[in-house]
Design a protein with these regions (language model features):
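Loop-to-helix entry region at the N-terminal start of transmembrane alpha-helices
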Residues: 60-64, 122-142, 186-187, 191, ...
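Transmembrane alpha-helices
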Residues: 16-23, 146-149, 157, 171-200
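Interhelical loop and adjacent transmembrane-helix boundary motif
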Residues: 2-4, 34, 49-57, 199-251
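C-terminal transmembrane helix and the adjacent membrane-cytosol boundary/short C-terminal tail
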Residues: 1-11, 94, 150-161, 165, ...
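Hydrophobic alpha-helical transmembrane segments of multipass integral membrane proteins
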Residues: 59, 63, 67-79, 83, ...
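Transmembrane-helix boundary motif in ABC transporter permease subunits
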Residues: 1-5, 70-102, 115-122, 175, ...
Length: 262
C-alpha cells in the first residue's frame, strides 16, 4: 500500500474516532446504574431512561419542543413551498439573489438571530415568548424547506404542468393536482429535515426561553449546570435515535443526495 493511501486511511479513522467517540461514550453512560458518569458502566440499567419520563420538567420541555417544531415547520412550509415553486419556474436574473436572501438565516449566526428576535419581536412588539420562539424556528427552517423542494421540483418537467393547463386546468388546479403529487416525497423530506433542525436548536432558542417556556435542548443544558448524573446521556440517546429514524425516512423517500444538488 502506498504511503499516501495509508495516511488517508489513518486520517479517515481519526475523523471517525473524533466524531463518533463522544457519542459512544454518551451512549454507554446512559445505561449506567451508578449516579456518576462511569465509562464503561460496571452495571447496566434503564434507570435513567425511566427517570426521564417521570420528570415533569423534561416531559414539559419535550412537549414545548414538539409544539414549536410542528408550528414552525407548518409556517416554513406555507412560506417555503410557494417560494420554492416560484424560484424553480423562473429564469430571471434576480433568481440567485432571492435564493441567497432566503438562505440568509443559515448564514447569520444563530445567537445574532436569537438576540434580534428577542429585542425586536418579544420585547419591542411584546409578542409572547412561545410565539416568538415559533417565529424564530420558522426562520431557521425556511432555507431547508426551500432547498429541498427546489431540488424536488427540478425533477418535475414544466411541460406536464403546461399540458394540464392546455387541457383546461387553471394554474392553481394544475399546481395542486399535477405538481404537488409529484413532489410529495420532497415536501415530506423538507418537513422532516426542518423538524430535526428545530428540535435540536440551541443558539436561537436560548434567547427566547422564559418562565415555563423552554425546549428540551435548553432544559438539558440547564440540567447539566447543577447535576452530573446520566439523565442527560439517556436523553441524548433518545434524541439520536429520533434523529436517525427521521434521516432514514428522508433517505427512503428522496435520498440524502438531494441536499447536495444545486
Amino acid at each position: 500500500m502506498k504511503r499516501s493511501g495509508l495516511v488517508l486511511i489513518l486520517s479517515i479513522l481519526l475523523v471517525y474516532v473524533f466524531l463518533l467517540g463522544p457519542l459512544v461514550i454518551i451512549s454507554f453512560s446512559a445505561f449506567n446504574e451508578s449516579e456518576f458518569l462511569d465509562f464503561p458502566p460496571k452495571v447496566y440499567s434503564f434507570r435513567w431512561f425511566f427517570r426521564i419520563f417521570e420528570s415533569e420538567m423534561f416531559v414539559s420541555a419535550f412537549q414545548t419542543s414538539l409544539f414549536v417544531s410542528l408550528l414552525g415547520a407548518t409556517g416554513a412550509l406555507l412560506v417555503g413551498l410557494p417560494a420554492a415553486y416560484s424560484l424553480s419556474r423562473t429564469r430571471a436574473k434576480w433568481r440567485r439573489a432571492v435564493l441567497s436572501l432566503f438562505m440568509s438565516p443559515v448564514i447569520v449566526p444563530g445567537v445574532v438571530l436569537g438576540f434580534a428576535l428577542l429585542k425586536h419581536i418579544v420585547i419591542t412588539l411584546e409578542i409572547e415568548i412561545l410565539t416568538g420562539m415559533a417565529m424564530g424556528h420558522m426562520l431557521i427552517m425556511i432555507p431547508y424547506v426551500i432547498r429541498v423542494i427546489v431540488s424536488s421540483l427540478s425533477n418535475v418537467p414544466i411541460e406536464i404542468e403546461e399540458a394540464a393547463v392546455s387541457l383546461g386546468c387553471s394554474n392553481t388546479r394544475a399546481f395542486l393536482m399535477v405538481v404537488i403529487p409529484n413532489i410529495r416525497s420532497g415536501i415530506l423530506a423538507a418537513c422532516l429535515l426542518a423538524f430535526i433542525t428545530s428540535l435540536n436548536d440551541v443558539p436561537v432558542t436560548i434567547f427566547l426561553t422564559g418562565p415555563g417556556v423552554t425546549t428540551l435542548p435548553i432544559q438539558m443544558l440547564s440540567y447539566v449546570e447543577y447535576y452530573f448524573d446520566p439523565t442527560v446521556s439517556a436523553l441524548s440517546v433518545l434524541l439520536m435515535l429520533l434523529t436517525v429514524t427521521i434521516m432514514i425516512v428522508i433517505e427512503s423517500t428522496m435520498g440524502l443526495s438531494f441536499f447536495t444538488k444545486k
